[in-house]
């Protein structure tokens, strides 16, 4: 059967096989080995995601020195790819422990397949946190520019399931007029569905929806560049959770369950992601914090020994800087505000004391 064929009613997919090419079994040393579509697609996904993330990091000017953000993304990519694959494999092993109970060492045979995206994302997030903690960079800013490349990579990588004839959806009856279907060869069918030939191509559904989420994230990136740090991350978490829940409802092949239960692990992961993501977005964009500027002026006047009118003027200037440069680092905002708080206003305060007061003022303006 052709890899895909179009008819009057829609599109039918049929995998040409899992190998791009394969050495004949009689070939010395490499007989039977070859390049798999899944591996090739994963490599393409990583490369495309890396190039996009580098471009977004530079466009966002995450580092003052040109090219520095791109270099940092390359270092981050190594951390994330390694930790992501390890996490995805560990998650698979834990949710398919019955396959490895008798031979635990086979868990290291990753070339046999078996990775789950939720584990990769969790491990990657941990690696990103540790890297940012070690280097002192703003992790949310880098996480935000990573998310479009991540979901685009997922859209590409999901086609690996097509070539492997795995992770397919519920069977489609012969008389069904549903326009999309994938042919699954007999040896790849679940035993309880062996009498069916065609199934829902959920790999295709998710790939398309991932592209929709990618377009949404990119639209947010260019249309609303001043959104709070972390907005793209939690939008991705919410969006992908919404995509994954119906995907799992249809899925009948290669299903991962919580150990000792009949509950799909992806249901739990998606439900947690959905609740956490929505909760974080609500928390980040809760009722706008409008600080009491008069109260802050009184506080600053007392702490700095200023007249109330002078303190009020300084608070107003700091508030204007806060509104205009809300995405700037705290240190950058302090630098912008310091010319408005010269030593002549408070000769009894040192430069360090004035900087500390301005820093505290900005924190109070943010409601912290």
Task: Set out the residue ranges of the language-model regions.
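Long, low-complexity, intrinsically disordered cytosolic termini of multi-pass membrane proteins
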Residues: 291-368
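A feature for loop-to-transmembrane-helix boundaries and adjacent hydrophobic helices
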Residues: 1-310, 363-367
């Amino acid at each position: 059967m052709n890899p895909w064929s179009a008819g009057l009613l829609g599109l039918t997919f049929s995998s040409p096989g899992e190998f791009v090419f394969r050495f004949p079994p009689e070939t010395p040393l490499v007989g039977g080995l070859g390049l798999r579509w899944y591996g090739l697609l994963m490599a393409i996904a990583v490369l495309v995601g890396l190039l996009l993330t580098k471009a977004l990091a530079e466009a966002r000017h995450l580092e003052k020195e040109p090219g520095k953000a791109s270099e940092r993304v390359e270092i981050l990519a190594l951390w994330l790819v390694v930790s992501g694959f390890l996490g995805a494999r560990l998650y698979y092993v834990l949710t398919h422990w019955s396959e490895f109970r008798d031979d635990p060492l086979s868990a290291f045979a990753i070339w046999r397949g078996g990775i789950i995206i939720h584990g990769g994302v969790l491990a990657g997030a941990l690696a990103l946190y540790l890297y940012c903690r070690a280097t002192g960079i703003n992790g949310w800013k880098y996480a935000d520019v990573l998310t479009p490349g991540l979901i685009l990579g997922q859209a590409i990588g999901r086609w690996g399931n097509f070539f492997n004839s795995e992770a397919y959806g519920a069977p489609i009856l012969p008389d069904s007029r549903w326009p999309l279907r994938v042919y699954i060869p007999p040896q790849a069918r679940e035993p309880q569905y062996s009498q069916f030939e065609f199934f829902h191509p959920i790999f295709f559904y998710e790939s398309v929806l991932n592209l929709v989420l990618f377009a949404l994230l990119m639209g947010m990136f260019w249309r609303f560049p001043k959104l709070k740090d972390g907005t793209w991350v939690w939008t991705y978490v919410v969006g992908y959770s919404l995509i994954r829940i119906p995907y799992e409802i249809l899925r009948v092949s290669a299903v991962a369950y919580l150990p000792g239960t009949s509950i799909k692990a992806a249901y739990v992961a998606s439900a947690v992601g959905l609740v956490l993501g929505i909760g974080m977005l609500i928390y980040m964009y809760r009722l706008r914090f409008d600080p009491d500027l008069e109260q802050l002026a009184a506080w600053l006047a007392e702490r700095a020994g200023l007249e109330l009118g002078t303190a009020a003027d300084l608070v107003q200037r700091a508030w204007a800087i806060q509104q205009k440069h809300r995405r700037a680092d705290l240190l950058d905002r302090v630098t912008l505000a310091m010319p408005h708080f010269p030593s002549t206003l408070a000769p009894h305060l040192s430069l360090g004391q004035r900087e500390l007061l301005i820093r505290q003022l900005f924190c109070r303006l943010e409601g912290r």
